[in-house]
Structures are given as structure tokens and as C-alpha cells.
Amino acid sequence: MNFGATFWGPMISFALFVWFTMKFVWPPIQQALADRQKQIADGLAAGERGKEELDKAQAEVEAMLRDAREQASQIINQANKRQAEMIEEARAEARSEADRILASAREEIDQEIQRAREDLRKQVSTIAVQASSQILKREVDAKAHKDLIDELATQI
């Protein structure tokens, strides 16, 4: 067996195969691996960005909820405050109305008392005039005078 041809033939064939593979087959494989590696790295980076954005969005949502709760609390406090003011205004108005009604009633009572006193004075003066005229018509007698005064006193 001829060692030179047997050895160099496959060796040259193998060298040509390696050169052909390195020249035409290996660059697309390396490019595909690099592209895949880049895709994976981009995917991981996108996942990290997505996670960061999700965390940021959750923080914003929590802040918005906190603000909404604070606003709701402020609105409730303002409503309670306004309610208390309205109740106090209504009470004050009711008190002033009650005072006005009481003053009006007292004034009417005073007027009625004045009218009653005036009527009483008129009646007393009328009775006094009648009594004096009857006394003058009768004879001046102490007993008759006393009886007449007692009778007039019972009329009053």
C-alpha cells in the first residue's frame, strides 16, 4: 500500500472540506448563532425593561390610589364640615325664628293685657259712677252706703 497517496489524498480532501466549510458553511452558522444570541439577549433585556415598567406602573397605580383615597377623604371631610355648618345655620335660623315668634307673642300678650286693663278701668269707672249716682239718690246712711259698696265689690 502506498502510504503517500493514501495519506495525502484523504488529508487533502479533508483540508478542502474544512476550507469549504469554513468559507461557506461556518459563517452562516456563526451568523445564525450570533443572531440567536442577540435575540435572546434582546428578549432578556426586554423582559427586564418590561419588569421595570411593570414595577413603575404598579408604583404609579399605588400613588394614584393613595391620591384618590386622600381626595376622597378630603371630600368626605369637606362634606361633613359643610353638613355641620348647614345644621348650625338651620339651628341658628330656627332659634331666631323662635325668638321672633316669642317676641311677637309677648307683644300680643302685652297688648291684650293693656286692653284688658283699659276695659277694666272703663268698667270700674262706670261702676263707680253708677255707685256714686245711686248713693246720691238714696239717703246718706252708713249701713246703706256699706251695703251698696259691698254689692259693687261683688260685681267687680
From Swiss-Prot:
The keyword Cell membrane applies. It comes from the Bacteria. The keyword Calcium does not apply. Keywords: ATP synthesis, Cell inner membrane, Cell membrane, CF(0), Hydrogen ion transport, Ion transport, Membrane, Transmembrane, Transmembrane helix, Transport. The chain crosses the membrane at residues 4-26. It is found in: Cell inner membrane. GO terms for molecular function: proton-transporting ATP synthase activity, rotational mechanism; proton-transporting ATPase activity, rotational mechanism. InterPro entries: ATP_synth_B-like_membr_sf, ATP_synth_b/b'su_bac/chlpt, ATP_synth_F0_bsu_bac, ATP_synthase_B_chain. One of its GO terms (cellular component) is plasma membrane. It is a single-pass membrane protein. F-type ATPases have 2 components, F(1) - the catalytic core - and F(0) - the membrane proton channel. F(1) has five subunits: alpha(3), beta(3), gamma(1), delta(1), epsilon(1). F(0) has three main subunits: a(1), b(2) and c(10-14). The alpha and beta chains form an alternating ring which encloses part of the gamma chain. F(1) is attached to F(0) by a central stalk formed by the gamma and epsilon chains, while a peripheral stalk is formed by the delta and b chains. Belongs to the ATPase B chain family. NCBIfam families: ATP_synt_b, PRK05759.1-2. F(1)F(0) ATP synthase produces ATP from ADP in the presence of a proton or sodium gradient. F-type ATPases consist of two structural domains, F(1) containing the extramembraneous catalytic core and F(0) containing the membrane proton channel, linked together by a central stalk and a peripheral stalk. During catalysis, ATP synthesis in the catalytic domain of F(1) is coupled via a rotary mechanism of the central stalk subunits to proton translocation. Component of the F(0) channel, it forms part of the peripheral stalk, linking F(1) to F(0). This is ATP synthase subunit b.
